[in-house]
Amino acid sequence: MNNTEIIENASKVLEAIDAAKEEELRNLNSLVQPRAPLNAGSTPGEIINEIKHLSTRDQEGGTSSKDEEESGAGRTVAEGAATRDHKYSKSRPKKQPRSGLQSGAAGKNPTPDGEGGDTCNRELDQHSDGDGHSNTEGASSDLASIQPCQTDDAPCSSTSYLDEEDEPAVRPKTQCKQSGLIESKEDEDGMLSELHEQHKGRSKRLSALGRVNSSPIPSPRPDELLKKGHRREYSMVWSNDGVFIESWCNPMCARIRPLPIREICVCGRCPLKCSKCLLDPE
């Protein structure tokens, strides 16, 4: 934007503000008829005094006239402010697009009034050098990216950054978190169904084989090892090396009691001689 355009816009704004100020003064003069009318050179103090005079006169005259005049004054002030804002919005300069792509996108939709052509002309002017020579290379590259509309009613197609020959996007396969392998949707559903069946509630009554497979044999507690005459599937005996160890033998003769090494069974695992050892001396 040149300096001359900035100065012109500023002058238009000032003119709009002065016009709004004069209109507000005329509205105040219409309300204050008995006293001397206010002019454009009135100070803010004089305007405030006039407003105070109106308020005191309304209080003496009655509440009805006061409400009517206040509503009228409020409407006039609001209308004046709306007019000022409307004029100021009209006088404000419009922002120009900085890049050639933005200006091209804004002007690629031609209208009967020729707005699209004006946009293209402004685009060429923006690409011109300071000496007046136009930069035809930049303008041609920008204009090449603009796609013309097929019909006047149909909207223009946006610039596509993908080639027409590209294949459509395909849903990627999901990765299984447990196995670390890439599985398809069907495999994932089958795996979920199998897990659901595995975690279903089992029956409380189990057979002997099921109990053996499901629950392991509990290890003995230290206080149970000290009980005498308690039948278990294990026994604490003295080994030939003189070490008190845990041995597994016939439950009928497996009595937990510390015995000296001379009283060990023939098999070397039972505290006393049992029927099994007598029948099978080996």
Curated annotation (Swiss-Prot):
One of its GO terms (biological process) is symbiont-mediated suppression of host cytoplasmic pattern recognition receptor signaling pathway via inhibition of MDA-5 activity. This is Non-structural protein V. Blocks host interferon signaling. Residues 135-161 have a biased composition (Polar residues). Residues 49-60, 120-134 have a biased composition (Basic and acidic residues). Zn(2+) 1 binds at residues 230, 249, 274, 277. Zn(2+) 2 binds at residues 253, 265, 267, 270. Keywords: Host-virus interaction, Inhibition of host innate immune response by virus, Inhibition of host MDA5 by virus, Inhibition of host RLR pathway by virus, Interferon antiviral system evasion, Metal-binding, Viral immunoevasion, Zinc. InterPro entries: Paramyx_V_Zn-bd (IPR024279). The keyword Metal-binding applies. Residues 29-225 are annotated as: Disordered. It comes from the Viruses. One of its GO terms (molecular function) is metal ion binding.
